[in-house]
Structures are given as structure tokens and as C-alpha cells.
Design a protein with these regions (language model features):
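Extended carbohydrate-recognition surfaces in non-catalytic/accessory domains of CAZymes
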Residues: 22-103, 158-169, 174-177, 185-204, ...
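Accessory beta-strand-rich segments of carbohydrate-active enzymes
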Residues: 28, 40, 78-197, 388-390, ...
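Disordered, acidic Ser/Thr/Pro-rich linker "stalks" and the adjacent N-terminal cap
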Residues: 51, 55-60, 113, 825-895, ...
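Glycine/proline-rich low-complexity spacer/linker segments in large multi-domain proteins
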Residues: 118, 138, 143-185, 279-291, ...
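Substrate-binding/catalytic cleft of secreted carbohydrate-active enzymes
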Residues: 298, 353-601, 605-608, 614-626, ...
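Active-site-adjacent substrate/metal-binding segments within catalytic domains
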Residues: 61-89, 93-101, 106-114, 119-122, ...
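Beta-strand-rich structural segments
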Residues: 222-226, 293, 636-639, 680, ...
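Short S/T/G/P-enriched beta-strand
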Residues: 610-635, 644, 689, 694-723, ...
Length: 1001
């Protein structure tokens, strides 16, 4: 108790005492003491409007948070609402500049201060700022009012143009002010804010050049846009100080003094070499604070602290380098809303770290935020946890022209300016569908103007043949390149509810059972009598599918030849309140549920992704649980990166598993016996390298409560939350994996129950009666603005109850302002350590290059079968006697593997014969795939290989449940959307072919 009191007092002292405005610059938390009204009252802009009966809220707070995961995305309420705030500036603010920064509003917003209209912001995605100085009443109360319309069909007022990304499929409409708001008070000589929307300013830019990773050196540059709003010239000195993560100053330097005329904007710069640097990396969120200050007449008048990191990047030869080490992209395409049940996207900064940090714990190195610019809080979170980001601006499924394209370029410009100091962003993405070469060049020019030194690649989805793109990649399919890197923007759309273990245990869900219809993402209409099995998995089959799909990218990793895949991102990390195809009214493709409780695929990816390219740490995971009825006989699946896996039941060996897709081991017909099930992995030398076990749990006896919270303590600011975890345990403290008990919760004290999610009516959103699923569940509890003790009790029929006590610490708010900036107290995580200096992969294959080709038809197009362009192909004329092509190799070689991408890869099986000179080295039918196939051929020394069709191809989609979102388009070589794509005759069609020699280790 004494320690709790001491922590309480220290926290109070640390975040209290809002002093008078400082001599330089103040940033205030502007989230407190807002008032919310749902409905349109034009008079609400007036200062004297009576708002005493409005709902009191702390931002960030969407007006419709109660609907998150209760309603499907297209049903989320859209309407007009007003937010109002009363505040006073601290003493000493007079004659200073005052700016307000909104990290984002949804959708279109009109802003008023003291009854005066100050501006409009409409894109619903990016931050916006306003200069309040002309309207502020110093020493008096000020009133800010914001009218917001989150209509799904909101159109830009000036042009009547709808924003492409205001979409009912992917952009969950949590309307109002769902992000943070800050107030800045500065001198009249000041560094601008990076808020191009409305203010037209670019702020501070920090970057490093001449990075030498091994010697830990780099030249650090600081650049600030400044303004002089005095009525006389000011001679301004520019100074820079760099502090390490512990706050220790490691370097100070300065630029030349500059005379800035009244009303003038100038850019000041300084740079210096710094040694002993720690470079930001995957799982290594090492961040520095760079303080840039302005000095006039020997006095500091302005200072901006920028938290950033330094890292080295390179993009080329189909690969990506981070700090001189090749890294294959492994991660998730996550909805930008990154939402939670009962609150939507508006969670405290520490909870963003928890969620994004789980991706790193899952051995993901990349998150691709889909369609819309991510929230600044998530961007900064990824900096801290060491998670690479691909930053979207705003789009939907198509390239656009006219005003809609201009909206996209403007948003990209604003997003780059706002986020260019965040080291975790390595990619700027210009579209969720291929854009034209001209548009790619235009976007690239924006990057070059506003972030020329950030070490970031700019590209778009696909871009398979546009060399101006610096990266690209399709959805669902596998791409390879020896030019700009290709990584899959989205793969494995399958869905599975966490509750469903398998068909052998409660609730006995057979794979695929559920609906036979789903809502189309293109038409928003229900498609009936469709195969929806892939969207109603149990956890066994969901895990297997995730293993199979990743294997496609792992097989093409760096080290397997000249043309490689740079990996891919699985859709999605956590279940999401967006477009779905399964039974529930939300998408369950996540490897965690919406409360971030892991499903089995979470652990499968942890196994498969533990390395920069090659596996560096062998792991093993047994899929499922070990609690069944005595007569159950079932397959046991193990995911492991070991070379061999042996299964033991109560110490008795059940033999070695059948290995498929490199990572999946199957043990058929295992009879259940209570006790301990162990899987042991062995390396290539037969030495044990990893081990996992499952234990049979006993009868459910008791409830266990635990809490996940801010590492700096729970804050009574009306926005902070704790994540309450509830488990059902046996008498020995083992979780009961089949428990589905309904738990009733009571909360006493200053806190608000926001709840969790479970299968049932309204998904149990906000309900204090919440069942566990597979023995576990979680709920969110939000603080109020009153600090104090909170007690939570949990009860269920037939189980021993549990309770837990918490305490929230006070946060001082004075006149609507607070010094407490939640993200500033959170530290970078260094869990994976610094970038290793060793190579990330070993070459396992080498290519035998092609000199030329002779074909039975269309000779002039034969080169297209080996031109590193997946949008081109060679094909014959449809006659069997012309269905052949002979390749001349650069050297005589014993080719033992042929890798091909054949047109119609998911629809067609080609009956082929392959010859080395005159000797037959392979004969058979090719498998259907999502891109490339690999044929193991008889190695014969030759410098000439012929591919010949020996009959009509067999048709039929091999991946009927894998469907695209975009509308049909002609000319796509998968032929999936092509008219008569399954009518083959005697066509031989090759997109790309590679001849390989394996380097046996």
C-alpha cells in the first residue's frame, strides 16, 4: 500500500502544476473538458450559446463509439454533431502566437473560435491547424466550436466531389473528433507547424545522411521553416541539440545567423557528424530527441523537440535493405482505424503500443495501413515498438482523374509533411490499385519536394511494369522482381472466429460451416449461393491456410535467385469492424480477435517469421488444445521451423510428423489420452532445437482476473483505459480451453465499463455480462476525470468469483488545458536488439541466365517470357504443333529446378514435357497456383531447354474462394476476370520462366 501511495504522489507531482506560459514555446493537451451534442444547431457556434446540458467528454471521442463492432460498418451512424470547448490561456500568453492542431476529424468540419468562423477541413483523414491569434481573448474565457458532418456521401463543398476513401467497406466511420487535439503557444518568431492543410506550413525536418552502420556514424541535418511576425527585422540564430533516449545530450551544433524581415518566412539549417549512434531498426525503437531552437539577441525565443530515429535504407535488385541488412517484408495489412469494440479507434497511446507491439512480438516487421493516412498516434507508436510502416495517403480501389486525383495528391503532400520525421515509415503508398506512369511520376515529385532525404520508397499497389515506382506488389498473388522490390500488399483474406477450435471439441465447428452468401465489397449487395467456406474456418484450418499462403512468399525469398519476392502482408492483424464475408457482422481475418487475444495463426506466424530473411531462431507451436472426450481420434498439427518434429504423449513417442509447406507437420489419427502432449523439433543434425507442450486442463473451478495497463500508471483523464483480462481456470490454475461461461462484472468507483466482444446478440458490446471464449476474454474500462480506487468483481454460476482493485492517478487540468502529453512518457522498445551485422540469408539457389529463345509461334515475343515483367507474356497461336519454346542458356548447367509463372495460373493446369537438349527431364501437369510453380527436373548437363505442351490444358479455378475486391479488368494474366479465360485450346502461355541450380547445403 505504501508503494502505491508513493507512486500516486509521484505521478501527481509529475503531471500537475500548469505554470504560466514559458518564455519559449508551450504545447498543451487540448483534449479535456469538451462538450458534445449529436444534431445540428447552427447557433452552437455562438459564444453565449447555452451548452450546460451537453455531454461532457474527453477527447479523442467519436460520437458513435457505442456502435463499434455492434453494427456492421455500413450501418455506422452518419449525421451532424457539434463539439464545444471553454478555455483560458495561462498568464504570460498575451502577445504570443496561438495555434490549435487537430490530428484529425471525420468527415467535414467547420471551426469557430469565439463566434468567428476560422476554416473548413473536409478530407476526414489528415491533421489540420488554425492560427487562433487574431481571435483569442487573453485573460478571458474563449469558446471553440466545431460542427462536423460524417455523412458517408460527404462531398467537397467547392467542387461537389466525393472523397474516394470515404468508403463503406474499409473506412470505419467513427465520426466527430476521434483523434487528439493540441494547443501551441509560441513567440512571434517561431518554427512553423507541419500542418499544410490551412496553415500552409511545413515545420521541422530532421534526417541523416552519410550513414555508416558499422562505425555508428552519420551526418545529422536539422531544417526548420520559421516565421517572423514582429513588425521589425529579427536576426535569428539556429541551434540544435541531440539527446539520446535517456535524455543525455550527445551533440550540439548551430547554423548561420539569418536576418528575417517582418512577415517573412525563411528556412534555417544546421548539420553535424555524430558518432556512437544507435540506429532505429525492426524491434529496436531507439529514438533521439532533437531540439531545434531560435535565438534572438542572445535569448532563446522558440524551441521544438522532435522525437525521431536514424536508419539507413536501400531499395533495388528486388530487395530491401535496412541498416545494410536485407529484410524480407513480413507483416499485416491493417485497417487504419485499428479499432477496438465499444470505443472504435480512440484509445490511449499506451494501448496503441500494446497492439502494435504485439505485431512485433508476432515477428512481423511491417504494417501496411490500408487506404487512408494512419493516425499520428499509431505512427509514433510504431516508432517506439520498432515496426516498419507503409503509409497510405487516401484512395479506394481505382486510379482516378480530375478532382479526385488532386484530392489524393494533396493528402499525400500533407501526410508526408506531417509524418516525415517518423523513422518507422519506409514506404509511401500512392494507391490500393495500380496508378498510371504519369501519376506515379507526379507522386514521386511530391516526395522529392517535401522528403528528399528520408530514405523512403514511394510506389503503389501492382506497378509491375512501371520502373518509376520504387516498390510495388499485387494483392493475393506472388510477384518477383530483380528491379524495384515487390511485396504482396494483401494476402490470405480467409476468416475464422477465435471461439472455434475444431470439429472435435466444443462448439464443434466443422471447417467452412456457416453462410452461403456474403456482401460484395464492390456493389454492397449480398451475393447468394457462393462458396463462403474460406470465411468460416475453425482454428485448425485457419492456421493451416495461413501456413500455406506464407510458404508461397518464403519460397521466393532473397537467396533463391536473381528474381525474388520481398515478402508480403497478411490481411489483417486484429479482427476489424469493416467489410466481412463470414457469418459475423465484422471481419475475422485477424490473427488476434478484436481484443488482441491471439488465435492459433498468431503463433504460426511467430514460428515462420523469426528472422530477417532466413529463419534465425527455430520455434515450434502445437495447434489447438488438448482437452477432448475419451473416444476422440484426430489429427494433430504442429507448426515449426525445425527440420524434423517428433510428437510425444505422456512421454511416449508417436513418431515424426509429415512435413508439408516447409513449416507444417501433421500427425494423423492421434487418440486422445489426458495428460501432456509434447512436440520436439530437431535441426538437420538431429539435435533438439525447440519444444512445445499442451496440458489437459481439469474441470473449470475459478475465475482469474488480471489487468494490462499503461506502464506509467492509469490516468484519471477521462480517456485512459485499462484492459481487463478474465480467464476460467481449473483448481491447479490451468486455463480451461473449452470454457464458455457467462461472466457477470460489477464496477465500483470512478470508471466506465466499455466491455469486450463475444459471439451472441449485439456481439455483447458494452454488456457487463460477457462470456469467455476458449476460456478467456477481455474488456476495456475507461477512467473518469475523478481519480480514485476502482474495484471490479467477476461472478459466474458454478465458479469461484474473483475481484481486482485498481487506482487511477489525477491529471491536472486548468482552464481546459493540461501539460500531460500521453505519448511523451512512453519509451521505445529495444526487444530485438540492434541490427545484426551478419548476413540475413544464405544463397540456396543460383539462376542460369537465358541468352535467347526460339518459339514455335510469335517469335518476336519470346523475350517476354523472361523480361522481368509480369504484365507481359509469350504465347503460341493456339495450335499444338506450335506450343513449344526453346531457351538457350548462358552456360552449360545441370538445371534441377524450373520456376514458372504460367498465364491463368489459378485456372489452368498445363500438360508439359520438358527436354534438356533431346533428353526428357520432366513430364506431367503443372499445378494451379497463386503465381509461381516449381518443377524439380532431372539434372542433365545442357545449354538448351525446351518447354513443350503435350495436350489441351485442364481448366477450373483452383482458388475459387480467393476473390478480389476491384472490378473486372481486361488484360490481367491470371485470366480470372477475363471473358472465356478458361477456354484454352492448345495454348502455351508463359509470363516468366527461370532455370535454377540448387546449392545443397
Amino acid at each position: 500500500m505504501r508503494n502505491k501511495i508513493l507512486l500516486f504522489l509521484l505521478t501527481f507531482i509529475g503531471i500537475s502544476q500548469i505554470a504560466a506560459a514559458s518564455a519559449v514555446r508551450d504545447k498543451y493537451n487540448f483534449n479535456a473538458e469538451w462538450l458534445l451534442y449529436v444534431g445540428d444547431i447552427p447557433e452552437a457556434k455562438e459564444v453565449r450559446f447555452q451548452d450546460a446540458d451537453w455531454k461532457k467528454v474527453t477527447l479523442p471521442r467519436p460520437f458513435n463509439e457505442d456502435e463499434a463492432f455492434r453494427l456492421s460498418i455500413e450501418q455506422l451512424t452518419d449525421t451532424v454533431m457539434w463539439y464545444r470547448k471553454h478555455f483560458r490561456l495561462p498568464a504570460g500568453s498575451k502577445n504570443k502566437k496561438v495555434f490549435v492542431e487537430f490530428e484529425g476529424v471525420r468527415q467535414g468540419a467547420d471551426f469557430y473560435i469565439n463566434g468567428e468562423y476560422i476554416g473548413l477541413h473536409e478530407n476526414g483523414a489528415m491533421a489540420v491547424g488554425f492560427d487562433l491569434t487574431p481571435y483569442i481573448k487573453y485573460g478571458q474565457e474563449n469558446v471553440m466550436a466545431v460542427r462536423i458532418d460524417n455523412n458517408w456521401n460527404y462531398k467537397e463543398r467547392a467542387t461537389g466531389t466525393k472523397y474516394q476513401w470515404s468508403d463503406r467497406n474499409f473506412n470505419a466511420n467513427y465520426g466527430g473528433i476521434p483523434k487528439n487535439v493540441w494547443l501551441h503557444v509560441t513567440d512571434k518568431v517561431y518554427q512553423t507547424l507541419p500542418l499544410y492543410s490551412n496553415l500552409k506550413t511545413t515545420g521541422v525536418y530532421i534526417y541523416a545522411e552519410d550513414i555508416r552502420v558499422k562505425s555508428r556514424k552519420a551526418v545529422v541535418h536539422a531544417e526548420s521553416e520559421i516565421k517572423n511576425e514582429y513588425n521589425r527585422d529579427k536576426k535569428v540564430a539556429y541551434k540544435v541539440e541531440v539527446l539520446d533516449r535517456d535524455g543525455k545530450s550527445i551533440k550540439s551544433f548551430e547554423g548561420t545567423q539569418t536576418v528575417v524581415k517582418p512577415g517573412e518566412t525563411a528556412t534555417l539549417e544546421a548539420s553535424a557528424e555524430i558518432d556512437g549512434l544507435h540506429f532505429w531498426s525492426w524491434g529496436y525503437g531507439y529514438l533521439y530527441t532533437v531540439k531545434t531552437s531560435l535565438w534572438v539577441d542572445g535569448r532563446k525565443v522558440d524551441e521544438v523537440a522532435t522525437r525521431t530515429g536514424f536508419r539507413k535504407t536501400r531499395f533495388g535488385r528486388g530487395m530491401i535493405w535496412l541498416n545494410d541488412r536485407v529484410i524480407q517484408m513480413k507483416g499485416f495489412a491493417q485497417r487504419t482505424s485499428n479499432e477496438w469494440p465499444g470505443v472504435g479507434m480512440s484509445v490511449p497511446a499506451w494501448l496503441s503500443d500494446y497492439s502494435n507491439g504485439l505485431m512485433v512480438e508476432d515477428n512481423a516487421n511491417l504494417v501496411r495501413w490500408m487506404h487512408i493516412t494512419p493516425w499520428k498516434q499509431d505512427i509514433e507508436s510504431c516508432d517506439r515498438v520498432g515496426l516498419i510502416q507503409a503509409m497510405q495517403a487516401g484512395d479506394a480501389e481505382k486510379d482516378r482523374e480530375g478532382r479526385q486525383w488532386e484530392q489524393r495528391t494533396e493528402l499525400m503532400r500533407d501526410a508526408i509533411i506531417y509524418n516525415r520525421n517518423n523513422p518507422s515509415i519506409l514506404f509511401y503508398e500512392c494507391g490500393n490499385e495500380s496508378i498510371s506512369r504519369e501519376h506515379m511520376i507526379e507522386m514521386k515529385a511530391i516526395r522529392d519536394k517535401y522528403d528528399p532525404h528520408g530514405g523512403r520508397a514511394i510506389g503503389s499497389r501492382e506497378m509491375l511494369d512501371i520502373r518509376e515506382a520504387e516498390y510495388g506488389g499485387e494483392m493475393l498473388y506472388i510477384n518477383k522482381s530483380k528491379h524495384h522490390p515487390m511485396w504482396a500488399m494483401e494476402y490470405c483474406r480467409d476468416e475464422g472466429l477465435r471461439k472455434y477450435w475444431d470439429e472435435y471439441s466444443y462448439p464443434y465447428h466443422k471447417n467452412g460451416e456457416g453462410n452461403n452468401s456474403f456482401r460484395s465489397a464492390m456493389t454492397n449487395k449480398v451475393q447468394k449461393k457462393v462458396d463462403a467456406r474460406a470465411y468460416n474456418h475453425n482454428q485448425d484450418s485457419f492456421t493451416i491456410e495461413n501456413v500455406i499462403r506464407w510458404f508461397d512468399y518464403w519460397r521466393e525469398r532473397p537467396g533463391t535467385g536473381d528474381r525474388v519476392s520481398s515478402g508480403g502482408v497478411k490481411i489483417i492483424f486484429s479482427d476489424t469492424n469493416t467489410h466481412y464475408r463470414g457469418v459475423e457482422n465484422y471481419r475475422r481475418s485477424g490473427v488476434t480477435d478484436a481484443m488482441r487475444i491471439p488465435k492459433d495463426p498468431f503463433y504460426a506466424h511467430q514460428v515462420m517469421w523469426d528472422g530477417w530473411v532466413d529463419i534465425e531462431n527455430p520455434r515450434i507451436h502445437i495447434v489447438g488444445h488438448w482437452n477432448y472426450k475419451e473416444d476422440v481420434v484426430k489429427p494433430v498439427y504442429v507448426v515449426s521451423s525445425a527440420e524434423k518434429v517428433e510428437l510425444f504423449l505422456n512421454g511416449k513417442s508417436l513418431g515424426n510428423g509429415q512435413r508439408d509447406y516447409h513449416f507444417l507437420y501433421t500427425f494423423k489419427d492421434v487418440a486422445f489420452v489426458p495428460g501432456k502432449l509434447e512436440a520436439v523439433g530437431y535441426d538437420k543434425n538431429g539435435k533438439e532445437c525447440c519444444r512445445a507442450e499442451l496440458q489437459t486442463a481439469g474441470k473449470p473451478e475459478q475465475i482469474k482476473l488480471s489487468v494490462i495497463q499503461n506502464p506509467k500508471g492509469w490516468k484519471a483523464d477521462g480517456a485512459d483505459m485499462v484492459l481487463l483480462q478474465v480467464e476460467v481456470m481449473d483448481k491447479d490454475g490451468r486455463r480451461c480451453p473449452l470454457a464458455n461461461d457467462l461472466i457477470h462484472f460489477d464496477v465500483e468507483g470512478p470508471a466506465e465499463w466499455r466491455g469486450g466482444i463475444a459471439q451472441g446478440k449485439d456481439n455483447y458490446i458494452l454488456s457487463k455480462d460477457l462470456p469467455v471464449e476458449c476460456g478467456i476474454n477481455r474488456a476495456l474500462i475507461r477512467s473518469l476525470t475523478t481519480p480514485g480506487a476502482v474495484r471490479i468483481t467477476a461472478k459466474a454460476d458454478g465458479l469461484q468469483s474473483a475481484e481486482i482493485s485498481l487506482s487511477s492517478a489525477p491529471v491536472e487540468v486548468k482552464n481546459g488545458l493540461s501539460d500531460y502529453i500521453p505519448g511523451d512518457e512512453l519509451e521505445g522498445r529495444l526487444t530485438r536488439g540492434e541490427t545484426p551485422l551478419t548476413p540475413s540469408y544464405k544463397d540456396t539457389k543460383v539462376d542460369v541466365n537465358i541468352l535467347s529463345a526460339v518459339a514455335g509461334a510469335n517469335q518476336d515475343e519470346a523475350i517476354k517470357s523472361f523480361d522481368d515483367n509480369e504484365l507481359s507474356e509469350w504465347k503460341n497461336d493456339g495450335r499444338l504443333n506450335s506450343a513449344w519454346i526453346t531457351y538457350s542458356l548462358e552456360r552449360a548447367a545441370r538445371v534441377d529446378e524450373i520456376c514458372m509463372k504460367l498465364t491463368g495460373w489459378r485456372l489452368r493446369s498445363y500438360p508439359l514435357e520438358i527436354y534438356a537438349g533431346d533428353e526428357l527431364i520432366w513430364s506431367g501437369e503443372t499445378e494451379k497456383s497463386l503465381g509461381y510453380i516449381h518443377l524439380n527436373v532431372k539434372p542433365v548437363l545442357t545449354n538448351e531447354i525446351t518447354i513443350r505442351l503435350k495436350g489441351a490444358s485442364k481448366e477450373g479455378d483452383g482458388f475459387g474462394q480467393i476473390v478480389e475486391v476491384a472490378a473486372p479488368a481486361a488484360g490481367e494474366l491470371d485470366l480470372f476476370k477475363a471473358k472465356n479465360g478458361d477456354k484454352t485450346n492448345h495454348e502455351l502461355r508463359i509470363v516468366e520462366i527461370e532455370f535454377k541450380e540448387n546449392l545443397w547445403q
